[in-house]
Amino acid sequence: MGQRFLTLYSKFFQKFLKSKKPPRLAGQWSRLARPLKVVFDCSNGVAGLVLKQLKTGEIKTYFINEKPDGNFPAHGPNPLNPGATNQLQAAVKKNKADLGIIFDADADRMFCIDDKSRFINPDAIARILAWQLKPKKIIIDVSTGWLVKKLQVTSYKLQVIESKVGHYFIKKMMRAENADFGAEQSGHYYFKNFFGLDSGILAAIEVINAVSELPYKLSDFIELLPKYYHQEINIRYQESGIRNQEIFKKIEKKYLLLNTKYLIRISHLDGLTMEFENKIGPASRSLGEGWWFNLRFSQTESLLRLNIETTEKSKFQKEVSKLKKFLQLAAR
């Protein structure tokens, strides 16, 4: 990466760093609402080249794996791989940091660790960014959970629009809807003021801006959020016998026979999505209480991806077991 381009690219991001200094002195983190300690794990990718050029002022920054290395000796380029965040979590704990941020190799994705060294679900990061950015429209994919989906019926005056999973579809929807912000479960965050594209570095900057303005620690913010149980489960074709879209029709038919009374919605936007209310009456419907699942084929791997979310842990385990059983039967 040429130094001139790197400098220009870094200057572009610099303007997003909030400052309460006079305009002629702006462009540092030193006058955020409160000082922070932040640990960056650059995964031996490109993030460190940009972040180290930013003026951080009184914000204490720590870098690990910041040197680009195509062999990715630390933990590989994917932050979601098992053990990939171990170094970052240890560094947050050791330095008593307020926040840890890890990037993938090209820094278009980022994930966060809170001040208690806990991994933060991307849905919660999207919620933080929505609180910080105050967008009027958010684009999400079908695997995004209630923490973001329910923003439009809780305390935020905004519109949440669902898209198919994937860069192409999110970017297309960002332009078509003139949306301010977009989020995917995969750790991609999209910004209108970044040409409608995804940027892990800009997402990191805005998370830092948000955390500095919280009246309490990041971990407190996370603990105050509504509690949902949400997970993506990957099922390989050869393990299940799944081969075509007929699987969705069979699953849909099975649930319609069992739960029609409690069905809230069905969507075929990307695979199959079905949402149900709990069996406690219609009052739960307005709050989105109950559970939902989405089944879709991966665009990049021979996998069927199952996303499921419930309001109770016991319900989560029960519905996962039931869905897996139905999948085995439907694949025959």
Regions found by a protein language model. Name each.
Residues 43-48, 107-108, 144-146, 312:
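Gly/Ser/Thr-rich loops at beta-strand to alpha-helix junctions
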Residues 51, 88, 129-133, 204-211:
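Buried hydrophobic packing segments
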Residues 135-151, 158-279, 290-332:
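Phosphate-binding and adjacent anionic-ligand microenvironments
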Residues 1-21, 32-95:
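Gly/Ser/Thr-enriched, mixed-charge loops and adjacent short helices
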Residues 25-26, 280-289:
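Glycine-biased, low-complexity coil/linker segments
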